[in-house]
Design a protein with these regions (language model features):
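Hydrophobic helical h-region of N-terminal Sec-dependent signal peptides
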Residues: 6-14
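Extracytoplasmic metal-acquisition and chelation regions
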Residues: 2-7, 20-334
Length: 334
């Protein structure tokens, strides 16, 4: 609770400073000397967009193309579940044209910001809005996998313990891309045709990825997998699998001795040979279980961040998801 009060105080300071110092901004990047009677895409200021974490950044960048400057808020080496904005982050969000975030409880800091920016120019896209959001899984629930009951259509900001990891299902990622496209088109109607074309091109790649998952996981020997935390419920539901998470929705949540025992028993009973861990948190619990049952550990990436080095190597959502598919195929056919 204290961290949200601190965030609220920072918001008040930022808004006061912004009100005192705001002035028209000139985009110096677009200095094309076209006749001023009709703006073209070369002379219009680009949209300034803040995206909460990597999937939102990638989806937005693919749709916006060169019509916007898209920046990511949460650094690649920081777990998004834990991140809180600084005063500088809040100022940058407040001065942006658009904030793109996943929602469904992923970014707990968003509601404070939105409640304090009423009346500002800031528009928002909750990319998961309108999707069927799953209930989360509690730490002490049974080890037979994720709660997969659908939740009501996601139309509010009262998320509770919902599962926010919708981007890990390519089929749902498509819907998030459409939500982003629609808001970009509303903000910049003159570029709506470009946004639609960009979205269609990227969605075609996501549809191909979706088919690769369907075909690649259809005839595996087993359908259950053990993973570090409950991030893969949507992927499991979409492709007929069962995730067995060591921890709940929070990746750094320490499982109880009872839960660890349940996971070990499940792994032994079902002859599990691979325990999945992820990149932004310690793999100690996964390694402990793997060691106890004589299994190996492997990465299943929740795609919550990529490094600048990975970007330079053209690592992206599509390539990481294909790595996840390959890892699942290998583990489920052992």
């Amino acid at each position: 609770m204290k961290k949200y009060l601190i965030t609220a105080l920072m918001l008040v300071m930022v808004l006061v400073v912004s009100a005192c110092s705001s002035s028209p901004q000139v985009n110096e990047k677009n200095t094309d000397s076209t006749t001023a009677s009709s703006e073209t895409s070369a002379t219009r200021p680009k949209l300034e967009i803040k995206a909460s974490f990597y999937p939102m950044y990638e989806f937005t960048r693919q749709v916006a193309g060169d019509r916007a400057n898209v920046d990511i808020l949460i650094p690649a080496n920081v777990e998004p579940h834990e991140w809180e904005p600084t005063a500088q982050d809040i100022a940058e969000i407040t001065n942006a044209d658009l904030l793109v975030y996943n929602g469904a409880g992923m970014e707990g800091w968003v509601d404070q910001i939105l409640s304090s920016t009423t009346g500002s120019k800031l528009a928002v896209v909750e990319a998961s809005k309108g999707l069927q959001i799953m209930d989360g899984i509690a730490e002490e629930e049974g080890s037979e996998g994720e709660h997969e009951e659908g939740h009501a259509d996601h139309d509010s900001h009262d998320h509770g313990d919902l599962d926010p990891h919708v981007w890990l299902s390519p089929a749902l990622a498509i819907q998030e891309v459409r939500n982003i496209q629609q808001e970009l088109s509303r903000l910049s109607p003159d570029d709506a045709t470009v946004f639609e074309a960009n979205a269609n091109a990227y969605i075609a790649q996501l549809e191909k990825l979706d088919q690769e998952f369907r075909q690649g996981l259809k005839n595996t020997k087993r359908k259950d997998f053990i993973t570090q935390h409950a991030a893969f419920g949507y992927l499991a539901r979409e492709y007929g699998l069962t995730q067995v998470p060591i921890a709940g929705l929070a990746p750094d949540q320490e499982p109880s001795a009872k839960k660890m025992s349940e996971i070990v028993n499940f792994a032994k009973t079902h002859h599990v040979k691979t325990i999945f861990f992820e990149t932004l948190v310690s793999s100690s619990f996964a390694d402990t279980i793997a060691s106890e049952i004589g299994a190996k550990s492997a990465v299943l990436d929740p795609l919550e961040g990529i490094t600048d080095q990975e970007k330079a190597q053209n690592v992206n959502y599509l390539s990481i998801m294909r790595n996840n598919l390959a890892a699942l195929q290998k583990a489920l056919n052992e």
